[in-house]
Regions:
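Conserved DEDDh/DEDDy metal-dependent 3′-5′ exonuclease domain
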Residues: 24-29, 33, 40-44, 53-176, ...
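N-terminal accessory regions of nucleic-acid-interacting proteins
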Residues: 1-45, 83, 130, 202-230
Length: 230
């Protein structure tokens, strides 16, 4: 692994991230068809979701409200509203996330997987939670030892800027801001970049940890799919 020490991460130059021109908002049937073709051609994709935050006691999240999938060259954002199950995006999400041929990589994906299952009935397959996989390689049980910020610092020598102000914005809004779009796209795209770097520079460790992570994710209890109204 990189020699960057955790206490120097905040002094590193910023991670530049994905460009706005490389982000696709999937809204129409044509957008969905293009996204499906591009993503199904990938061997691995970056993956994350965003949900509108809940602030009141007892309030139940209706997320995810945004699903982000990234190839090496682009990020695709799918807005998941109340009628998402019948939207053009739903078919893409089912086909890509349930495909056993595509590895899905991200950080801290437990809630994302549960919410996708509850809202859309998606059983995501071949998942690598990089926070778990990288922690296993390092031989530490420290829960937050390998978040995206730490991985970017140690692998790329850059500082990943995570704005809490953007994190807690309304992800259910029909019109996302440019800041929201870039933040969300980066979350998925940087996960794939980290996965590629890990596989290229530490192939044996990556292969073993990835196999264990996929096995654990696929063995997780599966809830019954929600019944859609007739």
């Amino acid at each position: 692994m990189s020699e960057v020490a955790p206490d120097t991460e905040d002094t590193l130059p910023p991670y530049e991230g994905i460009l706005l021109s490389e982000v696709r908002l999937v809204r129409s049937s044509e957008d969905a068809e293009a996204a499906m073709a591009a993503l199904l051609a990938c061997d691995a994709i970056g993956f994350d979701t965003e949900s509108k935050p809940t602030f009141r006691k007892g309030e139940v999240s209706t997320g995810p409200h945004l699903v982000q999938l990234a190839s090496d060259s682009h990020a695709y954002l799918f807005q998941v509203g109340a009628n998402a199950a019948s939207s053009p995006a739903a078919a893409v999400l089912h086909a890509v996330l349930e495909s056993p041929a595509i590895v899905k990589v991200g950080f801290g994906l437990g809630d994302d997987l549960r919410r996708l299952r509850a809202k859309l009935g998606i059983e995501t397959r071949n998942v690598i939670d990089l926070a778990t996989a990288l922690r296993a390689v390092q031989g530490t049980s420290e829960r937050n030892a390998w978040g995206a910020k730490t991985a970017v610092a140690r692998f790329f020598g850059r500082r990943l800027q995570k704005s809490r102000r953007i994190t807690t914005t309304n992800w259910a809004t029909p019109r996302l801001s440019e800041q929201q779009i870039l933040y969300a796209a980066d979350d998925a795209h940087v996960a794939l970049r980290i996965y590629r770097h890990w596989h290229e520079h530490f192939p044996a460790a990556a292969a073993g940890a990835a196999a264990n992570a996929i096995r654990a994710a696929n063995a997780a209890p599966r809830a019954a799919k929600p019944v859609q109204p007739g």
